Amino acid sequence: MSLSSVRQYLQLLQEKDNELKVIGLEKLVSVVETNWAEIADHLGDIENLYEDESFPKRQLAYYLASKVYFNLEEYEDALDLALESQEYFQVDENTQFVEVLVNTCINKYITHRQSDQTTKLNPKYESIVERMFAKCQRDQDYKSGLGIAVESRRTDKINEILSQSEESKRGELVNYLYDVCIKSLNSRNYRIEIMQLLISFYKEKLASQGLLPHEYINLSLSYHTLGKYEECSQLIDDLLAKNIPLAYQVATEISETQNYSFIKKVIQALPIEESNSEKRKTVIDILDGRTQREINQKVLEHLNKSDPLYIKQIHSAVDSKKSVAHTALILCNSILNAGTGNDQFVKDNIDWAQKSQLWARFASLASLGMIHSGKPEQAKQIFASHLPKGQAGGNTGGAPNYYSNGGALYGIGIMHSGTRDPETIRYLTDIIKDPQQNKQEPILHGACLGLGLAGLASEDETLFEVLKNVLMNDSAVTGESAALAIGLIMAGTNNENAITELLKFGSETQHEKIIRATGLALALVSFGQEENADGVIESLLTDKDFILRYGGVLTVGLAYVGTSNNKAIRKLLHYAVDDVADDVRRAAVIALGFVMFNQYEQMPKIMNLLAMSYSPHVRYGTAIALGIACAGTGYQEALNMIEPMLTDTTDFVRQGAMIGTALILQQANQNSEPKLEKFKKTLQSVYSKKHEDILCKMGAILSSGIIEAGGRNQVVRLASQQGFPKLASCVGMVIFTNFWYWFPYVNFINLSFAPSALIGIDQTLRIPTDFSFKINTKKSTYDYPEPIKQDDNKDKKEFEKVTLSTTNKAKARAAVKIDAKDSKMEEEVAGTSQAENKEKAEEKTEEKEPNSYIQTNPGRVLEKQKKYVEFIENHRYQPIIKERKFGIVFLNDTQNSDDASYLGVAKKQAEQKSEMVPEQAVGDQNDDIAPPEDFVYDENQQLLN
C-alpha cells in the first residue's frame, strides 16, 4: 500500500466522529504488517483511543498498538496490550504474532511460578496458560502440555495430563517426565515432588500390566532420589525371582550413582533367604561396586592401547634433574596407565624413579596406586617394601624412608577408594594411633589421606573421632590431611556434628593449610545437598577470612553440583568478579564448572567475559572450569575460548589452559578433532624447552597424561549414565584442582576416571567375546590416535664406514655386469609394471572406508559415539535394556548353551597349550642366524683406547 493511503487512515484517528476513527483503526490493522514503521510514529493517537473509556472500540485500538509493539520487538508490552484486546487476540490462531506472544506469556508465567511469588502476576497471563493447557489436551499434544506444566511447577496439571492421556501413550509420557525431571529440574524440593508422582504412576502400571526393563531402572532411581531404600531393595529382590539379569542391571544403576549411604541401606534391607543366598551375594557385590571394579580392570587391561614410545618421548625430552619435572613425569605415567596395571615404565627406569626425594617421593610412590587401582586386594603386596616397619606386611629391613612409608599408605587409600574395606580401615587406623608411627608427619599425612579414601562417604563416627584427635594437635601438615579425611568420610552426608566441628576449628586455628582443608572438607560434606547446605554456605561466604570464603565458593559448587541452578550461578559469578582475594575469585570460577557440567553447552556464554578478565586467576579458573564441564566432549566453543590462553603472558594461566584443553580433548583423534595434533605439538614444545617456566612444564607433562589417560580408554566423567552426579568422581576432581597448593593431590584425579566402553556381561558376571554390536560410523572417526612411529635412525650417532680399495673395485665390476642385464630386463618389465601400477591405483580409489563396522565385546565406545551403536537382531546375546548403549550392559543368552567364549578364559586355555609345547620345538622355529654387523671404524674410539 502507498504511503499516502496509510496517512489517510492515520488522519482518520484524529477525526471527532468515532465511526471514522473505528474505520481508520480497522484499515490500519489490515496493513500494519507492512506499514508498522509509519504507524509507530502515531502511537500517541492510538494510545489516546484505548485510554478513552467512552470510545466504543478500545479493544481494537489495543490490538493495533500490540501489533505495532510486536514489530518493534517489544514483546512484553505487545503481550500486555494484546491481553487487553480481548476477543481480537485469538490464542488458537496459527500466526507468528500469536505464537511469539503466547510463548512470552508462558515464559513470564514460568518465571513467576519459579520465583518466590511475592509480586502479583496479571491474572490474564494465567488465563492464557490455562487455554494453552486445554488446547494441548484437545490436540493430544501431551508432551507440550507436560513441558509447560513441569516448568511452571503445576503438579496438578501434570497429574491431570497423565491421568487423561490414553493408556497406550501414558507410559511414554511418564518416561519423558522422568527424563525431564532428572536432566532439567534444578530445584531439589520440586524434583522430589515430581518423583513421588512418578512412583505412583510406575507402581500403578506395574500392578496392572507390568513395566518395561528401562522403566524398572527409572522406578529404582526414583526410589533412590527419595531415599526409599526399603522399596528399592524389595524391587531388586522381586526381580531376582523372575529376571536375574534385570535385577543385576538395576543394582548396577544404583551403584553407579555412588550414593554410598543409600546403597548401604539397600544392602541391609535385602531379604535373607537361604534359597536365594548366592544371587543375593552377587547383588551385594554389584551394589558395593566390587563386581564393576573387577570387570573394569579386566577390560582396561584387555583394551590397553597405551603407547610406550609416548612416555619415552616425554622422558627423553624432559630435564629430570629438576624435581618438579621429575615428579610430574612420574604422575604423568601413572595417569597414562591408570587402572591398567601396566607399570612397565617404572620397572624399566627404577633407578631414575627412585631419585625423587621428600614429598616428591611421597607423591610419586602414591601414584602407583593409580596404576593398580582396579586391584585393591593386592595393595599390600604392591607396596610391601615401602610400608612402615612393625606393621603387617611392612618393610622389615633397611633404614626407613618416612616419605616412602607415607606415600605407600596414601597409595593403598587410592586403591581402596570407596571400598570401605574393614581390614584396610583397621590397618590405617592402627598406624594413626601407633605412637611410634604417628610422630612422623609423612606417615601420618599418608595414613589420614588413605583412611579418608578407604572410608569415603561411610559416615563412620569412630573414624571421625580418630581423625578429629589428629586435627586437634594443630600441626599444619597432619592437620590438613586429617581435616580433608574428615570431609572424605562425611562426604555427601551433611552431618551436623562434622560441620560444627570443622567450622569451629577452621575459625580458631592459625594454620592456613588447616583452614583451607576445613573449607574444602565442608564442601565435600555438603556434596549434592543443594538448599540444605545454604546455612553452611552463608557462614563461610560472609567470613572475614578469605580462606574460608575460598571454601565457601567450593561448597556452592559441590552442593549444587550438576544442577545448573540459577541462584548458585549468580552467587558464584558475584564472588568471581567482586571478591578482593584472588584465591576466592579463581575458586568461584572453577566451581561454575561443577555446577554446570550437566549443561556444558551453556558454559561459553557465561564464561565469555571471564575468559577475557584482566585477572590471571580468573582466566586460569575459566580454563579449568571449561575443562571440568566439557571433559571428553571435544566441545569446539570451549576449545576456542581456551586457545588464546595457551599463549598467555602469565605462566600459571598457560598451565591451566593446557590442563583444561587436555580434559576436553580426552580420547580425541586427528579425524574427530583437527586441533589435537597442534595441541600435542604445543605440549611437546613446552616440556622440551630448556628455559621454559617450570609451572608451564608441569602443566604440559600432566596434560600429556590426561589426554591419553587409562591406556587411552578412560575419561573424566562426573555423572552417571542417568545424569546423577557421582560422589567419588566430583570429590576427586575438586581435590585435584587443589594441587595448586599441594601437588600430591594430583593423584585424586584417579577417582574421576571411568572407562569409555560398552561391556556386555551375562548373569554369570563374565564377558562373552561372542557378543558383538554394530557402530554406524566410520571406524577412523572415533578410533584410537595413531601411535608414535619409532625412528630407528634417530638419536644414533652415524659413523662413516671404512672399506678396503680391493672391495670397491670388485663392487664396481659387479655393478657394470648388473647394469647390462638390467637394461635388457627394463624393456621387458616396463609394460607389465605400468599395468600393475594402474591396477593398484584403481584398487586404492575403490577401497573406501565403510560407514559402519562390527565391534566385538568388550569394545571402546565414547560417550558421543553411543548414539551410533546398534544391537544386532537375532544375535545370540541380546541386551536386557536396548536403550543402554554404553557402560556395563547385562545380556540375555538366547541359546543358554555351554559353547561360549569369555574374556580371560580363552587366554588361559592358550597359555596352557603353550606350556605343553617342548622347549626344543620352540628353538627349532628360528634356525636363521643373524648376519654380523657391518664393520665400523671409529677413529675417536681408537684414540681413546
What function would you assign to each model-found segment?
Residues 1-799:
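Extended alpha-helical assembly domains of large eukaryotic scaffold proteins
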Residues 629, 722, 735-945:
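Eukaryotic intrinsically disordered, low-complexity regulatory tails and linkers enriched
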